């Protein structure tokens, strides 16, 4: 996976291709990228555990890039849906730590962003690793908000909507290294 400070590729931000063959090819690419993301998260978790950390890994059921004007509440950022079988362990980890540090590892494939978010609490040596993915073109409003606010949020909830935790990040560019270019491109199109 590419780290946040690696240059972003020049993949277009429009919707994925639409013919049957193109969609099938994209599906295979997305499946491989998702599998690699999960493998990367598990390897990161193993490394942290070898260093003595308690690690919770979560493969999200869905990840939505939500701008402030989207959704039923005031939350904005990446909203991860945590499957019920991960919820108790996630909730317990959140209760144990403050998670003042984070890192993000991302890659893009065929208009989709694949990422692993590391939430780290050095005081308790607890780490939460979240694997998620979303369509890049659906993040335009969030990219603009994150750049304007100079911060980013990660939220976790269950499928039923139970809030499991929210985390503020000062470095939105780890999530969207191409934010300035995308916002300027959007302004040029207006």
Question: What do the predicted segments below correspond to?
Answer:
Residues 1-29, 184-190:
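Terminal disorder- and signal-encoded targeting elements
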Residues 27, 36-37, 47, 51:
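Subunit-assembly interface segments of extracellular/virion macromolecular structures
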Residues 32-33:
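A generic structural signal for short
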Residues 53-59:
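Short secondary-structure junctions
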Residues 59-122:
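Long, continuous compositionally biased terminal/linker segments
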Residues 127-190:
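Glycine-rich, aromatic-bearing surface loops/beta-hairpins
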């Amino acid at each position: 996976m590419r780290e946040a400070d690696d240059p972003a590729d020049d993949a277009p931000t429009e919707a994925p291709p639409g013919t049957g063959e193109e969609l099938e090819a994209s599906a295979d690419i997305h499946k491989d990228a998702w599998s690699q993301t999960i493998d990367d998260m598990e390897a990161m978790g193993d490394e942290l555990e070898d260093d003595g950390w308690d690690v919770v890994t979560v493969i999200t059921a869905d990840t939505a890039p939500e701008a402030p004007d989207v959704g039923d509440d005031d939350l904005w950022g990446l909203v991860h849906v945590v499957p019920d079988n991960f919820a108790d362990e996630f909730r317990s980890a959140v209760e144990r730590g403050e998670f003042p540090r984070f890192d993000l590892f991302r890659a893009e494939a065929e208009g989709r962003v694949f990422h692993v978010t590391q939430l780290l609490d050095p005081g308790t040596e607890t780490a939460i690793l979240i694997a998620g993915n979303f369509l890049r073109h659906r993040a335009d409003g969030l990219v603009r908000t994150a750049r304007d606010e100079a911060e980013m949020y990660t939220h976790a909830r269950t499928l039923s909507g139970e809030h499991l935790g929210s985390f503020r990040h000062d470095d939105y560019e780890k999530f969207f290294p191409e934010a300035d270019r995308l916002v300027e491109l959007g302004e040029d199109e207006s």
